[in-house]
């Protein structure tokens, strides 16, 4: 068992029953010229987040934790995004940006596109699981819950972008499904102003989970090495 110093209190977990979740570390969300950047969101401070996720993934993999990578997006025709009858059609900033700038149609969050791809620095390895998701929450219309339950996983450690959208949405849904969620705050980044990051972390540590950081996470895992049993 590993005890992780966190807010509002420490949390103890078995790395063999824990997954590291990497949320949407795609060019769309972390790279200049990607969807968030084109939609007017600041992505200039995402590089340290990428480096911190690399560190967290390395430590988690060495401890035998399952690594799950999410990619948010839809088919090239955007059928999966939903039409005017879906609130996603009206609220997705990617879809709204493409309607405002028709030359971007088919380029934002479309499967197979550069925008959809994970950033170059973050490469899934054999044994990792890569899951597409069509909405903010990684539990909606994906096999995530089945994958976790079949492996006896109850604790989820979250990294990725955006803290206040897909990270928080997935952690909240996990809370409702009886998963224990931890966010590594310096391995996440908000979509929007800095107060959005602070508000999301406040919500998580107060109502839905725990908040820690990458150095503390790595230190907690470093005392013992683990080997995942297939």
Swiss-Prot record:
CDD domains linked? cysteine_hydrolases (cd00431)
Q: What is its EC number?
A: 3.5.1.110
Q: Does the keyword Hydrolase apply?
A: yes
Under Pfam families, the record lists:
Isochorismatase (PF00857)
Q: Which reaction does it catalyse?
A: (Z)-3-ureidoacrylate + H2O + H(+) = (Z)-3-aminoacrylate + NH4(+) + CO2; (Z)-3-ureidoacrylate + H2O = (Z)-3-aminoacrylate + carbamate + H(+); (Z)-2-methylureidoacrylate + H2O + H(+) = (Z)-2-methylaminoacrylate + NH4(+) + CO2
Q: Which domain of life is it from?
A: Bacteria
- Active site as annotated: 24, 133, 166
Q: Name one GO molecular function term.
A: hydrolase activity, acting on carbon-nitrogen (but not peptide) bonds, in linear amides
**BP GO terms, sorted:** nitrogen utilization; uracil catabolic process
Cytoplasm is among the record's keywords: no
Similarity remark: Belongs to the isochorismatase family. RutB subfamily.
Under the heading HAMAP family, the entry gives:
RutB
What is the purpose of this protein? Hydrolyzes ureidoacrylate to form aminoacrylate and carbamate. The carbamate hydrolyzes spontaneously, thereby releasing one of the nitrogen atoms of the pyrimidine ring as ammonia and one of its carbon atoms as CO2.
Q: What is this protein called?
A: Ureidoacrylate amidohydrolase RutB
Keywords assigned by UniProt? Hydrolase
Signals that turn on the gene: Up-regulated by the nitrogen regulatory protein C (NtrC also called GlnG) and repressed by RutR.
